[in-house]
Amino acid sequence: MTEQRLLTPDEFEAALRAKGAFYHIHHPYHIAMHNGEATREQIQGWVANRFYYQTSIPIKDAAIMANCPHPEVRRQWVQRILDHDGYDGSEGGIEAWLRLGEAVGLSRESLLSEERVLPGVRFAVDAYVNFARRACWEEAACSSLTELFAPQIHQARLDSWPQHYTWIEAEGYDYFRSRLNQARRDVEHGLSLALEYCNTMERQQRMLEILQFKLDILWSMLDAMTMAYTLDRAPYHTVTREAVWHKRRLV
């Protein structure tokens, strides 16, 4: 058994980046979407369920800011909320995602109602938001380090989806384009916080576990979608074909 020790900053960054092997880009559901093998229902299901994640991100970021006592950090972190909620002449990522929904044939009303959000997806996303509320702000902030791997997945969608899914309207891809630069900027900030905060072996190991927790969330979301849209085993499928599960935020 290898003895654990305090990693150098370069070694710790390498350990964080190595977690990319478990990023949800490698999930069979994502692989199918990338390869043009997903059905219209599977694409729509992903867009509708992922919208719950998108609308929860600024709530998560607000929780981090509420727990952070440092104005200089809050001034930089608030940009993440603005990126999603929009400001002045910028529509924001949530609005861009609504247009993605329309581009794949979903109505804004359907997305905003959360009627399509699967319980497994809701539970996973809510676990992320609740972690951000309860953890110390440094740990909650660094849980966003899955952004280390995000530019790759956004670019992959831009490269493959227009070729495979000609029925998706072109303006729907604006969200992915906007996140290419935003994610890279957020990575620089989040990584610098992690390298500064994780100055003990215990903190480094805990942060690696937190990053794995976030990866588990993203993977579990796709597991829920696989059950519903690939295996045709939506919740309560042995009892009813109706979507009887709860469809609103309860907390």
Curated annotation (Swiss-Prot):
Its EC number is 1.3.3.11. The keyword Oxidoreductase applies. GO terms for molecular function: pyrroloquinoline-quinone synthase activity. The keyword Oxidoreductase applies. Ring cyclization and eight-electron oxidation of 3a-(2-amino-2-carboxyethyl)-4,5-dioxo-4,5,6,7,8,9-hexahydroquinoline-7,9-dicarboxylic-acid to PQQ. Belongs to the PqqC family. This is Pyrroloquinoline-quinone synthase. It comes from Cronobacter sakazakii (strain ATCC BAA-894) (Enterobacter sakazakii).
